[in-house]
Amino acid sequence: SLHRGYIGFESDSQCFLNTLHYVHHELKWPLTYYKHVITPLPFEEIAERPDKDVLIAIRQSLANLEINGPNTIIGVLPDKKMITCCDSKKLRPVVVGRTDDMVAISSEVCGLNEIMPDRDQTKDIYPNEREIVVIDNDLEVQRWKQ
């Protein structure tokens, strides 16, 4: 039976949070698999990958957790890392900007312009539909490709 925390979703945000919790804490899978659960690769692309057996199993067993956009996820994990990723259609924008002492994620570039007007905008990151951006506590920005 389902954990009581996964019953009665009232918003997309709850679905994303509960899916993240399920994948990372209940199944104890690495965070990198979260993106494969919510926006799996097409079977044609999976077939060409060395980890195809795992990705096919994820796609077949957790298809009910796939999102069908348009959505952008911006979140903070219990270890205080920030993450962001987009649905496979990438209809919702997201941008990551940084200065020497701050990294921020915004759903619109105007949000970054407001709080970081002096940043180097040429270094802004616009995540694509096949990646997760992770920002750790040392403000290191990582881009994890699917």
Give the positions of each predicted feature.
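Conserved short alpha-helical segments that host acidic/polar catalytic motifs at enzyme active sites
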Residues: 1-146
